[in-house]
């Protein structure tokens, strides 16, 4: 028998920015297969990730990423990347994402995410994709929204995710695990 401990995670919303109306896609994640970085191929986008991993995807996997501008990940530039107003759709379509810290960050900074179908599946959210074709369709769907519609979707998802914003509850859960 294996004991599995569910370690809770936590995100504190500090920016609470209004929705960004740019239709450019932003990607702030490692270049892991389950993060689906190949969805960016042919998409007007920015990627904030590791340069060497990016090169591998271009040279070994054959993706061009000709419409993607790469920014070398450095933690000190994280706020600057998310705070940009020239991208407003977050590539948050990560398969089997256990928590999704970067998804919370995108919401906090006013970016409307495209989610994988299995993430937060109990929340009804229309902008989900499983493959590249669906991902591209969701970019088009978001691009057609008015500012009010985008803001409403952002507010709804951000408000739902606030249940992970209670620091006292998070500390209590950790203490229960450590004291068990």
Language-model regions, residue ranges each:
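Short alpha-helical segment that forms part of, or immediately flanks, the ligand-binding pocket
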Residues: 79, 101-108
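Conserved active-site histidine-acidic residue motif and adjacent donor-binding/catalytic loop
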Residues: 54, 59-83, 96-97
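Nucleotide-sugar-dependent
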Residues: 89-103, 116-125
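A charged, aromatic-enriched C-terminal amphipathic alpha-helix characteristic of glycosyltransferases
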Residues: 133, 144-179
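Conserved donor-binding/catalytic core segment of Leloir-type glycosyltransferases
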Residues: 16-35, 44-46
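Short hydrophobic beta-strand element within catalytic cores of glycosyltransferases
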Residues: 108-116
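Donor nucleotide-sugar binding/catalytic pocket of nucleotide-sugar-dependent glycosyltransferases
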Residues: 1-16
């Amino acid at each position: 028998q294996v004991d599995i401990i569910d370690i809770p995670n936590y995100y504190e919303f500090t920016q609470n920015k209004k929705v960004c109306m740019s239709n450019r896609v932003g990607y702030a994640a490692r270049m892991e297969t389950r993060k689906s970085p190949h969805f960016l191929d042919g998409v007007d986008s920015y990627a904030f990730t590791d340069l060497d991993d990016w090169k591998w995807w271009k040279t070994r996997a054959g993706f061009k990423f000709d419409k993607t501008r790469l920014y070398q990940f450095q933690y000190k530039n994280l706020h600057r990347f998310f705070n940009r107003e020239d991208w407003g759709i977050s590539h948050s379509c990560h398969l089997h994402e256990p928590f999704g810290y970067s998804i919370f960050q995108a919401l906090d900074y006013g970016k409307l995410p495209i989610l994988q179908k299995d993430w937060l599946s109990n929340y009804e959210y229309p902008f989900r994709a499983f493959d590249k074709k669906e991902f591209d369709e969701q970019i088009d769907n978001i691009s057609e929204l008015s500012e009010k519609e985008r803001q409403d979707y952002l507010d709804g998802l951000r408000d739902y995710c606030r249940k992970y914003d209670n620091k006292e509850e998070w500390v209590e859960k950790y203490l229960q695990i450590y004291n068990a």
